[in-house]
């Protein structure tokens, strides 16, 4: 089994490339810090690079690779994560399209200390 950081696919560099047996996957990790009334939104500012990554993940999924967009929520006990359509509509559109084409979209909240970040629990993603 392989976990390789900073892996290239197409014209993008993803956070991770993973292999387990016959399975191969690319994963992109996004840190989430914008919270509104118990719900988190991403991105907090327009991100053309983020849209590019999502589209490249979709291309990977369409070729049969596993593709994952992983939101790491740096706030405890939030209710959901959603695309911030008000700030960057193209990101939300790309995310929904990618999810419809096989990209897995996951979110987890975590405990953050000065020395560590510990994944805690899965959080619903509202597309």
Where is each model-derived feature located?
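Structural beta-sheet core signal
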Residues: 26, 69-71, 107
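Surface segments flanking catalytic/ligand-binding clefts of nucleic-acid enzymes
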Residues: 19, 64, 109-112
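Short glycine-enriched, charge-decorated loop/helix-capping segments at active-site entrances
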Residues: 40-46, 83-86
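Histidine-anchored nucleotide/phosphate-binding helix
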Residues: 52-62
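Conserved catalytic cores of phosphodiester-cleaving nucleases, focusing on short active-site segments
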Residues: 14-44, 57
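A short acidic/basic microdomain associated with nuclease active sites
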Residues: 1-9
């Amino acid at each position: 089994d392989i976990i390789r950081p900073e892996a290239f696919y197409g014209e993008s560099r993803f956070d991770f490339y993973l292999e387990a047996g016959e399975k191969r996957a690319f994963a992109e990790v996004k840190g989430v810090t914008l919270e509104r009334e118990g719900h988190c939104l991403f991105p907090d500012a327009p991100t053309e690079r983020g849209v590019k990554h999502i589209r490249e993940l979709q291309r990977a999924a369409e070729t049969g690779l596993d593709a994952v967009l992983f939101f790491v929520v740096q706030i405890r006990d939030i209710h959901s994560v959603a695309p911030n359509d008000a700030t960057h509509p193209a990101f939300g559109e790309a995310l929904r399209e990618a999810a419809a084409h096989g990209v897995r979209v996951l979110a987890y909240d975590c405990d953050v200390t000065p020395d560590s970040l510990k994944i805690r629990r899965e959080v619903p993603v509202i597309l």
